[in-house]
């Protein structure tokens, strides 16, 4: 599903260069559930943005679902993003003036689907997250957990092959966080690839595969990296690969 090889990304200002990713290499297969961890500024959000076609890269190659991203026009990239990828954000990113139904409808409108088909997809997505009875409520009338479930439904409504979640439980209490994790596991169990950024090691442990991003490099925990390397204040370990 995701295949990056030697991807590098540098952010430049007038006097400063920040290397967000350096020779970053990763393969994430179809229907995997992967948790991405790392300290602030490590490059994990940059990786997620590039994976989601929200940002470009300077060097390397990226293949998404068998397509070479570097060969796509902006229009082709937008279409691929809309049809293949669902996004979940920490801050929900719901439109306050739209009710639940219309918030979930937003990505479908860009596809030009007929209204009847859109309604079927929206009702299906809201049923998955348990919010069918709330479709005419507005975000301000919902709890934080309910708002995030709306965000999950919006990400799910287009039946994407890839779900990218950036700190999806960051604004929720532990009970609500576990509900969102349950939803992500159900979505993954239905065959959708899920890639989740989180700071919470307990939530990350629910993913079958965990990856650490440190100083723009990748460490795959399947490589049996010693636990002391991840203790607060420990020296930055050498990357297992991609460095």
State where each predicted segment sits.
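ABC family nucleotide-binding domain
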Residues: 1-213
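Conserved beta-strand-loop-alpha-helix hinge in the C-terminal portion
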Residues: 217-243
């Amino acid at each position: 599903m995701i295949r990056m090889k030697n991807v590098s990304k540098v952010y430049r200002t007038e006097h400063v260069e920040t290397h967000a990713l350096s020779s970053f290499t990763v393969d994430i297969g179809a229907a995997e559930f992967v948790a991405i961890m790392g300290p602030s500024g490590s490059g994990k959000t940059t990786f997620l943005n590039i994976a989601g076609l929200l940002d470009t890269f300077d060097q390397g190659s990226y293949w998404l679902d068998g397509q070479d991203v570097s060969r796509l026009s902006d229009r082709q990239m937008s279409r691929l993003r809309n049809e293949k990828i669902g996004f979940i954000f920490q801050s929900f990113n719901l439109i306050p003036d739209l009710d639940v139904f219309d918030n979930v409808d937003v990505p479908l409108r860009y596809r030009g689907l007929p209204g009847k088909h859109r309604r079927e997809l929206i009702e299906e997505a809201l049923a998955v997250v348990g919010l069918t009875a709330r479709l005419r409520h507005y975000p301000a009338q919902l709890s934080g957990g309910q708002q995030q479930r709306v965000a999950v439904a919006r990400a799910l409504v287009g039946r994407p092959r890839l779900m990218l979640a950036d700190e999806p439980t960051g604004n929720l209490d532990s009970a609500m966080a576990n509900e969102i994790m349950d939803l992500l596991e159900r979505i993954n169990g239905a065959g959708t690839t899920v890639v989740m950024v989180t700071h919470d090691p307990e939530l990350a442990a629910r993913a079958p595969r965990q990856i650490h991003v440190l100083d723009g490099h990748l460490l795959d925990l399947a490589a049996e990296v010693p636990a002391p390397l991840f203790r607060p204040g420990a020296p930055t370990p050498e990357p297992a690969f991609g460095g």
